């Protein structure tokens, strides 16, 4: 070994001796295996209970009408029902067959041809797609009102007027009965005057009074409530009706009633003014009247001459009637200052149309008031209005 190699070896040894002694290597203990973490239980979503079933729909009551008697008023009541959207389910008339009913309803010499569709199908009268059962029973007790749903019955024959006579409709299934004439004992109502007195719990049969009472009573109500009526006389100049003769013939009631309707002005009796006392009790015994039957087919006029409790100028009377016609009696009482004549009121639906220019006053206490009415069409519309009102009051 050379001297140089010895030196290098010694240096290397010295260097090795000077290095720190390495720490003994400690083997790390193995970590214990990770314990599985408990998984949170899944949140159970609460399922809401099913909604309750919807309540059963309330059965909507529907007004249905039956008509007994298909004469002037019966046919016009059907027209009024069609115009007002009232459902007619049956017509009874023993003297008119189905085909003739179609003809009579379609054509009218006074009010013109019916503007809708009229036909018959499968034994029914069909008006504007409304199917109407037709019966030909001679007695009210025979009419099967139950079979068509127990309607409100319009008694339009002019024959059955009393409670005893018309209760047969109820026994046959009618729900209520409205008599299209004054009745000797049935409660009497005039729309716009006393309909609020109707009691559905005790009144199944009522009277719609007469066409003349329907004209006079609204007028008398306005005047009496504002100015007071001490006493009065009424005259109605009335168109001829089906009960009169086209030529002279026999009459049991009064001889001159049998004279030709087209040829004469015929004085006649009327209970219309006295009947006002039944619908306005405060006027009982204060009004009476008479009629002149004249040669016109339709539209009549009332002349009420009365003594007032409160001195009142005629202008104030006009103002009171005009206000009522625009307010609480709209559709029933009307007001005009036009130069009108009877044919201007053909097919007018009002009960009473006050003619402001035709009336006169002797002084502030004594006046003559004039009011027109279509004794057929206006009256028939009030019949339907009374039926609708009664239905609205029934529970």
UniProtKB/Swiss-Prot annotation:
Keywords: Cytoplasm, Glycolysis, NAD, Oxidoreductase
PANTHER family reported in the protein's UniProt record: GLYCERALDEHYDE 3-PHOSPHATE DEHYDROGENASE, GLYCERALDEHYDE-3-PHOSPHATE DEHYDROGENASE, TESTIS-SPECIFIC
Source organism per UniProt: Bos taurus
SMART domains: Gp_dh_N
Protein name per its UniProtKB record: Glyceraldehyde-3-phosphate dehydrogenase, testis-specific
InterPro entries: GlycerAld/Erythrose_P_DH, GlycerAld_3-P_DH_AS, GlycerAld_3-P_DH_cat, GlycerAld_3-P_DH_NAD(P)-bd, Glyceraldehyde-3-P_DH_1, NAD(P)-bd_dom_sf
Subunit description: Homotetramer.
Biased composition (Pro residues): 31-41, 48-57
Cellular component aspect of the GO annotation: cytosol
Residues that coordinate or bind D-glyceraldehyde 3-phosphate: 210-212, 241, 270-271, 293
Cell location: Cytoplasm
Catalytic reaction(s) noted: D-glyceraldehyde 3-phosphate + phosphate + NAD(+) = (2R)-3-phospho-glyceroyl phosphate + NADH + H(+)
Name of encoding gene: GAPDHS
Residues engaged in binding NAD(+): 72-73, 93, 138, 375
Residues the record marks as active site: 211 (nucleophile)
Family under the similarity heading: Belongs to the glyceraldehyde-3-phosphate dehydrogenase family.
Lineage: Eukaryota, Metazoa, Chordata, Craniata, Vertebrata
